[in-house]
Amino acid sequence: MHRRSSKSYSSRNSKIPERSKIPDCVIASNKSAEYNYFLDKTFEAGLVLLGSEVKSVRQQKISLSEAYIYEDNSEIWLANLYIPEHKTGGWTNHNPRRLRKLLLHKYQIARLRKDLLIPGITLVPIKFYFRNGRAKLLIALARGKKLIDKREVIKEREATLEANRALKHRLRRPRAQRNTQRSVTPRRTRENKNVRGSKARSARRNVRREN
């Protein structure tokens, strides 16, 4: 019997290429989360989706604005996430706002259950994306903001916008001044050179006449 050598087997395994990681593809984000809540800890959760849901999600047809998360019987659920029906789904199409189960480790669910017992703490969906071809949802423990806090956020945004405008205005002024200087100074130098040249020529002519 012919036996395979260990060298040939190892050389074959070394030639097998590693799987290239697919870059993350962000599908939707909850823009109002940072405005309405103070965000604390974040968790990455998987989702149980149907085939028609995955097709419509890959076309970036999804809305997180009205979605919310709650805990029930040691399980985390995502409610009111809007995923529209797919065109080619037919009778197998899904309900656009059905309940969807979030996939988390047991120790993560235990931590979330303890934190949710604190008054004023809730779970908020932040971002929906694909990682290595799998649907993921970034969720966060959050505390609701008051009207005073929201006004402070608006003031900070306005202050940053004004500062950026002032910086742009300062950066634009020197360029305009440089352009005006460049356009004016060469003409003056040329005129001075022409005047000097004409004076020198007239002086030479006078010297020749005297001689």
From Swiss-Prot:
Entry's localization field: Cytoplasm
Cross-referenced CDD domains: SmpB
SS bond list: none
Any one Pfam family match given in the protein's UniProt record, by short name: SmpB
Stretches with biased composition (Basic residues): 196-211
Biased segments, Polar residues type: 177-186
Gene Ontology CC entries for this record: cytosol
Gene Ontology terms: biological process: trans-translation
Span list, region Disordered: 168-211
Keywords noted in UniProt: Cytoplasm, RNA-binding
Record-linked Gene3D superfamilies: 2.40.280.10
Molecular function in Gene Ontology: RNA binding
Domain of life: Bacteria
Summary of the function given for this chain in its UniProt record: Required for rescue of stalled ribosomes mediated by trans-translation. Binds to transfer-messenger RNA (tmRNA), required for stable association of tmRNA with ribosomes. tmRNA and SmpB together mimic tRNA shape, replacing the anticodon stem-loop with SmpB. tmRNA is encoded by the ssrA gene; the 2 termini fold to resemble tRNA(Ala) and it encodes a 'tag peptide', a short internal open reading frame. During trans-translation Ala-aminoacylated tmRNA acts like a tRNA, entering the A-site of stalled ribosomes, displacing the stalled mRNA.
PANTHER family: SSRA-BINDING PROTEIN, TMRNA-BINDING COMPONENT OF TRANS-TRANSLATION TAGGING COMPLEX
Similarity remark: Belongs to the SmpB family.
Alphabetized NCBIfam families for the sequence: PRK05422.1, smpB
Name the record gives this protein: SsrA-binding protein
Lineage: Bacteria, Bacillati, Actinomycetota, Actinomycetes, Micrococcales
Gene expressing this chain: smpB
